From Swiss-Prot:
PANTHER family: NISCHARIN RELATED (PTHR15454), SERINE_THREONINE-PROTEIN KINASE 11-INTERACTING PROTEIN (PTHR15454:SF69). One of its GO terms (cellular component) is cytoplasm. It comes from Xenopus laevis. LRR repeats lie at residues 112-133, 135-155, 167-188, 190-211, 213-234, 237-258, 259-280, 284-305. PROSITE patterns: LRR. The lineage of its organism: Eukaryota, Metazoa, Chordata, Craniata, Vertebrata. This is Serine/threonine-protein kinase 11-interacting protein. The gene is stk11ip. Transmembrane segments: none annotated. It comes from the Eukaryota. Residues 342-360 have a biased composition (Polar residues).
Amino acid sequence: MPSEAPESLVQALAQILHEHDSLVAGDKVLDGSRILTLLTPCLQVVTRLFEQLFPRGPGTGFQALPAHPADSVPILRAQFMLDMLQKTPSLKLVHPAECPRQFDVNIFPFKSLRSLELRCLPPHCLRGLRSVYSQLEVLICYRCVSSLEEVISLCGGDLSSALPWLELHTLDFSYNTLKDLDSSLELLNSLKISDLSHNQITECGSYLKVLSELQYLNLGYNYLTAVPELSIGTTAKLHSLILRHNQLSSTCGLEHLPNLQHLDLSYNLLLEHSKLSSLTRLHNLKQLFLEGNPFFFQKDYRALTAQHLSPKAFDKLLLDGSLLSGSEIMNAQMFGEKVRLQPSSSATESSCTGDLTDSYSAAEKSAPRLLRKKSRVKVRTASISERSDSEYEQRGQPVVLQHQRDIERTDSFREQFGVDWLQYRSHLESELDPDYVNSSHTSPPRASPSPTNPNTDLKHTSPSPAPECPRPPSPKTSVITPDNELMEKVEEGLEEHLWGLQEAKKTSEEEGLIGEALCSPVVVCPVLNGQPRNPDWPWVFLRITHHFLLEMDPERGRILLKRELHSLRGIQKSSAPWNCNGEEQELPLLTLSFESVCEEKQTVNYVVLDNSPESSVTILLDLLHPMLERNLREKAESQDDLTRMQCLKCKTEFRHEVDRGDICNPESIQQRKDPTAKGLHRNHTGDASCPSCGSLHIILATLNSIGEVSTPLRPVSTEPPQDNYVGGGQATTSFYLSDEEDSSEADSSPNTAPSEAERTVFYSFDTEGQDQQLAMDTGRSSLTGSYKYTALSQSGILPQDGWQISPGTTQTLDFRLVDHRLKLYIDMEVLDGDMEEFRCCMKVPVVCFGKALEFWALVAVSNQKIYFLEITGEIRGNPGDWLQPAESQSLTLLTHLHVGLQEQSLHLGFDSCGGAYTLLTRNQHHCRVFTKQILEILSELPARYHSNLQQSSEESITPHHRLWPFIHDKLGMAESNSPPEFLYVLLFFLREDVVSPNADSSCVNTDSQLPLVNTASPAALTQGARAASPVSLLITRTHMYLLEEDHQWLPDTRTNELPDNMQMKEKQPISNISSVHLIKSASLHLRIHLYNETQQNESAWLLWTEDPEKPREIVEWLREPWEAEYHIHFNPVIHDT
């Protein structure tokens, strides 16, 4: 709650809205280009003040304050504020977490409201919605709604019955706790866009049918098991449907959406491609997402998917983000031909050929077999005809016409069988068999299997599954011709051959499984909800093998269903009343629990109907109990290894209770359906939360005390490590997001970098103020991985390809990019302000005024402060182990932002209560980009905070400058205050007194001692700068200077007599240069060989820069004065390595 008086708060708001230079300027708010965002305590103070100023209470329509002295500035600003609120079209209300939930907020001043967004504000706390609901066009509620009725029908805290919302076209109720829809949607006649994602909706019912104008519907991240029902008007207008992360096992219902263009079914329970048969009618489909479904991991996933799509959508369809290739379309057509060539079995055959996986059972629905093209009504001519008729037909068949018919028949044959038509040439050349033709005329056409009633023909058939999406038959009438007869003959031959092979293979597999049975068949009745699962044929044989539980057809001995016993999670024996031949009996009931993604397959009940049911149950239990104990033991061992978690906020380590371990418990199933036990801020995606603080930011636990990880280790590679960095260093461990299937494993091998198929996730902040997640991926297109450990070798600072902290070795320089581990640490441990958001960060050596030495620091910038986090050790493991918060300064106190000499550093100065800092970037491009991003962040602040900022993009040289004595040309013909040209570079230096005869020898002087401070980057360390010391290189037209500076800096407004902070380390005339050496493999390194004729000694300057362009720039600076001295070409020596 703000501590200011209501009047002062209103004055401050009015001043903010009146400043046109501010990002929240009044004109931008009024024209709708900006959204007015207010905290609920602030709005409460403002509305209560206005209520006091209206003695008779607020009325309807636009209002003005009662008459007051015209020269009263507070009253004028209050009137301005009231006018602004009455004309504001877009409002966003944010309810802070520390405020009580019983907190009334009135929006009566907003008379022209068109868009309203509520964040974390309970609807019952909102007043005044009934006066504006009829004109609202956009309504957004985030983490505050538990039912639609309390907002749409009751108008929040007004508790009044609402009429239709006439103008509302966009409704966003995502990230809430909605469990069901209700009839309040009937009031949204004009709704076009609806986002109900990230809720707990299990069923939509028929409530969405009233939305006849709906064009976009997002129901992702819910618990839907079926496609929602829509009205006829909606089916014609809907173009985008998002159903990702649900529990859909079928697409039935999508065939009624002919104009659908964008469809997202990712991460559902679609087990087979046949479930996509409803997509064949979506001719306008442009984008389809199916990743994460069980069939997504099949080898020919894209081709099998394409065969169920409309051919009209092939050219323009994006499947999982990429266009279908020509080969995939061709493979899809080939798969389609194979499906059409498979014969249709009779009802008797289909009843015994259930799916041999645990995905389907005999009583479950399955997709119908595709109809053959030849299944059509045959219209025959009369078998007895007049002689004159036949003679006339024969006379009307000239030779030319017969030849033409042969050609057409050949072309039709080639079109039917494609490139393989020559294999069936014998069928084309052979004469048609008259007996076969006659028999084919009298035989009925084949049809797809259909449900049969076993009571009518119990001896020949058993129940068969009903088709999932029945379609009305549309027979095509055509006259039988010899061409059609030939096609039918060839097709029937192929069908018989293919069907025979499949039947033989299936029979052999079933015989192998039955031969492994551990017990005799037991007669049981599968029960579902207290009733037989298949009332027409209730009993089956139950058999157990080493790996499967088999349900078999008692008539023909065929396998109807099989379940894998390694997923068995529970056994329960009880009794159930059963009616046998009119007598009520108590029979044993065996309940088995399995681990499955489909809820209906998690539990199966069998009533034992054997002659001796008790002994049969005992035999089954004796076989199943050892298997159950083995499964539970393996599960416990895997949980011990894989589920030890750590909270990034409170550092608590705990073991995560995996949902699948509780599948056998009905309470756990109900708890999974209702994950709101811990409030509105629950993660709806199923992630775990910390039991201590409730935080969702958890990771796999780090290394334990003996150096082992909590996950199984891969075997250490026997290949020698490939370390690209000079020097030793212990292997350190970091974790990142991986796409590999074995993502829970840990890599204990040192010096192992992530493979190309793996990725690290970064977070960045865009200019609009929204968090974006950027995946730097070189292998795959989707993020489906998990946390994973890997080891990297380093020295001093972790190589940039391990943690990706800018500036690094990535292709693009963007200080907004930050590793996801570091982003979590900064959000949890560093940022402490209200509504404070991360913006950018930079790893850079920093010099703080008053401290002698520079140190590695992570400079993190938020929308409120700048944090200087000292890097105290190797970058690995928990960021809290190698990051120490040093100092922080408010952005509102920043008074000076100056770029150092020749963009080698950046100076930040704060007011009298703050400090002064120098960022030694040693790179012009890094300094320029980071300065630009700081200025962008400062532009978000109100104008009064950055209007007094003193900024300079270049450091000027005056006679009082510290470098003036070195760069001033005393031999110049005229005195001038403008200095001559010079080159100034911050780099790392190492001297060699004796030059090795081999110019390619190592750059490191083994006799040199490691300096106390070495802030060289990993790239410079790799190229030999480990023993170098930081210096400043100054090159004039005659000399080269090596200067030691402490880089202490104070703003001009606080200039004092600073002690001498610079001394000359060495000076060499350019004429002493004997040669200059560049190395292609070390772009940051430069060797300058020197020879002093007076002292007759040789030496070398070994230089390392942080900018790969600087070595060549130094060479070009030395070229002109050296050639002017010796009048010969100055050619550097370039080495490969």
